[in-house]
């Protein structure tokens, strides 16, 4: 699922957690002023589902779907409403939650098409080099299909757009 995460000033915490709470139609409580609350409804920034994983941190919907994909929250993981409702129905209290800060994502489709995505370094935590990307692609056997100049341009852009590399096959 695509997500929005915490701003640089309020980053989403990386680590291993477990779902602590689940709530339908949650009430939003302003982290700056706990007296300021918004009941469930179209004006609630949490949307209609809350999956709490660490104190005040959670995974939730949003009333601003255009914000998904950015560094926009107070540290929570923000999802499109239909996505969080799907996730909510699949998990239960106690389900493991693994939050990783990883700027490069490699995807291998069932038809063996390999693609990669490079995301912005919103927290200035993960400097990427061409070698880092090549090493990640090597794990899928497609590192020789990407030129260093093209990888460097993708790192410079860091826009999260897909780069389709090749179809990988094991030959016997």
Describe the role of every protein-language-model region.
Residues 73-88:
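Short beta-strand-centered segments at strand-helix junctions
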Residues 105-112:
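Short, Lys/Arg- and Gly-enriched loop/turn segments at beta-strand edges
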Residues 65-75:
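Short, basic/aromatic beta-hairpin or loop at an interaction surface
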Residues 1-67, 86-89, 118-121, 125-172:
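Gly/Pro-biased beta-strand-loop elements
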Residues 93-97:
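Loop/turn positions that initiate beta-strands
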């Amino acid at each position: 699922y695509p997500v929005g995460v915490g701003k640089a000033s309020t980053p989403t915490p990386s680590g291993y957690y477990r779902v602590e709470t689940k709530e339908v139609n949650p009430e939003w409580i302003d982290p700056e002023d706990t007296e300021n609350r918004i009941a469930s409804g179209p004006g609630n920034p949490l949307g209609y589902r809350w999956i709490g994983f660490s104190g005040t941190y959670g995974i939730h919907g949003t009333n601003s779907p255009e914000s998904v994909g950015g560094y926009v929250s107070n540290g929570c993981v923000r999802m499109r409403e239909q996505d969080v409702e799907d996730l909510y129905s699949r998990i239960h209290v106690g389900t493991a939650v693994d939050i990783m800060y990883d700027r490069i994502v490699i995807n291998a489709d069932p038809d063996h098409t390999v693609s990669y995505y490079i995301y912005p370094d919103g927290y200035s935590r993960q400097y990427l080099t061409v070698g880092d990307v090549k090493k990640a692609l090597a794990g899928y056997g497609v590192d020789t299909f990407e030129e260093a100049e093209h990888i460097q341009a993708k790192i410079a852009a860091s826009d999260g757009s897909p780069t389709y590399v090749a179809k990988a096959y094991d030959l016997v």
